[in-house]
């Protein structure tokens, strides 16, 4: 196994790419979907079962982990991999996005941000330097630069100011990250939906130099059309030979559209969160297992799916345990959704390698257009 | 595999017994502990993992299943085994106990009992005949006779009246059960803590004749001393050559004491319920994982335990995920508790077979007397 972090592109099809990220903790096949293990667990899943769905890498959240159990405690306990029993690569975000979306009483300055915990109201501080320290204590393999995300809606001027602050923070992140062989630091492009700002941000990041580049500030309510609009040009501003990570995306059709536009990595809570709210994702679209139409249905969610939920249980059972608020409903639906997402990624990788992405995408949309199987 | 239900005693040690119940769906090694899968799931566990802990048989609850998803629906879907993905033996209770403890507005007559659902207030009826029908629709391997449990505290006269009603219902249950090769009907001894009533009840049941005999009306708040007092004589009133099932028991030391007194089968929600409330059972007693002493503890719950929670996670992790209300806390602690219970049963079976139960029980109590490992 390699002792350094590297990325090899093995095939392209149009703007879409497939390849392999190598790390000392294992390979990440791209395009990759990263399940989210917010607070040291992918909710309702054992890590060996997350791996069994085909996940090569998990995402952990700096904001949640710094508050509880704290980065220092995780470090004393041997790091996040050991703590949560996942020995493959972990990417941690920088905390910037969650501070914006979850914390109370934020106070922003050039230096960083102070805020109060949403758990107990305690006061905390994040800066590029502290975020790098926390992510080092957690032991993450892919570290994200600390950035600021403006609350939407925002004027173009506010987006520009915020992006330039994030670029100054990106440089401080790079300096604070230091020399850590086998670990990677990714910069995060900002600039909202404004092409000039995206280009300026990308240029600033390339000037600093990172092992990978994220596209931030999307999937925050702008809608798929606006997001794809940015993805039509933004990946092209980034170096060809480094992985491109679209943060917080998304629904299956968002993922397919992003991969078509040259994205290599994504993460989203959607498959696991949906599992806990009774939503399943299949080749034929979304299934609401709460719906009474499933009450007597002996068929699996998707007869072509090989996940445990589809292999061994009827829609009627899944409906029953969801309605009865049984934990197994979250366990089985989350497993199914993560399995479906990873199967989709494998399909995309195979199609790109074969130069048949167009056919794959057409079949993907055709199956969804059919909709769910007819009620019995 | 056998096509009939049978019980073979293979060894005894004092009053304790070990043996095998054979059914068309597999063998049940006794003494057996049956995890409770109330509404079609052992909470927070996948059935294959319940099996991996060593469970030979599960218990399902007639009361819960008749209300939701209904016995008729389960039958249309192929029976409870298929519905919940458990192909080994299932014992169902008769519904009598839960009607007493959970339902609203009960109305009792010689014929049976009407009540309102605790879920939606809908009106339902149970009688010996309807309970037999429901348990047949569910497809359970071991069917329990329909009985009445008096609310405690009760006068001896009330306990006697209730027991005699249950004995008349036991006869009606036997008649309604019919001829079902491979399936068993168990009668339930009642009579509270009064020896004469227990003897009268046992005689009535033996006169009717059952494939097995349960001891009901214990573990309902009378305390361990009173329960053991009854178990000092009650099993002796029952036929030697049929399994004896103590309903709703219990804590590990209750189980050991019951096995010493000649009990072959038990069930209890305790290991799974405790798992969801942060209580773990180990060789050294009870561990409250919520306690702050575990916050920095890198050691497993029990270093000698081979369950996934102990093999791969620290007390600090279990503490963290419990405090963060993560589903994995319920999953891992339930798994550990069920594993511990089954390991205890295997220890009891092996000790009885070797004629060394006394030593085993002494070591069991000695380890518990030591208490949990010292904090770091």
Swiss-Prot record, chains A, B:
Cite a GO CC annotation.
Answer: cytosol
Question: What top-level class of enzyme does the UniProt entry assign?
Answer: transferase
User: Where is the segment annotated RNA binding?
Assistant: 248-254
**Cofactor(s), names only, from the UniProt record:** Zn(2+)
Residues the record lists as binding Zn(2+): 305, 307, 310, 336
Note accompanying the cofactor annotation: Binds 1 zinc ion per subunit.
Catalytic residues (positions): 93 (proton acceptor), 267 (nucleophile)
Reaction equations catalysed: 7-aminomethyl-7-carbaguanine + guanosine(34) in tRNA = 7-aminomethyl-7-carbaguanosine(34) in tRNA + guanine
Superkingdom to which the source organism belongs: Bacteria
Query: Which residues does the record give as substrate binding sites?
Result: 93-97, 147, 190, 217
**A Gene Ontology molecular function term of the record:** tRNA-guanosine(34) queuine transglycosylase activity
From the UniProt record, give the pathway where this protein acts: tRNA modification; tRNA-queuosine biosynthesis
SUPFAM superfamilies in alphabetical order: tRNA-guanine transglycosylase
Cite the entry's keywords alphabetically. Glycosyltransferase, Metal-binding, Queuosine biosynthesis, Transferase, tRNA processing, Zinc
Instruction: Extract the Pfam families matched here.
Output: TGT
GO biological process: what's one of them? queuosine biosynthetic process
Q: What is its EC number?
A: 2.4.2.29
Quaternary assembly: Homodimer. Within each dimer, one monomer is responsible for RNA recognition and catalysis, while the other monomer binds to the replacement base PreQ1.
Recorded hits in HAMAP family, A to Z, give:
Q_tRNA_Tgt (MF_00168)
Hey, which family's this protein in?
Answer: Belongs to the queuine tRNA-ribosyltransferase family.
Task performed by this protein: Catalyzes the base-exchange of a guanine (G) residue with the queuine precursor 7-aminomethyl-7-deazaguanine (PreQ1) at position 34 (anticodon wobble position) in tRNAs with GU(N) anticodons (tRNA-Asp, -Asn, -His and -Tyr). Catalysis occurs through a double-displacement mechanism. The nucleophile active site attacks the C1' of nucleotide 34 to detach the guanine base from the RNA, forming a covalent enzyme-RNA intermediate. The proton acceptor active site deprotonates the incoming PreQ1, allowing a nucleophilic attack on the C1' of the ribose to form the product.
Xref: PANTHER family: QUEUINE TRNA-RIBOSYLTRANSFERASE (PTHR46499:SF1)
Q: What is this protein called?
A: Queuine tRNA-ribosyltransferase
Name the species this protein comes from: Cereibacter sphaeroides (strain ATCC 17029 / ATH 2.4.9)
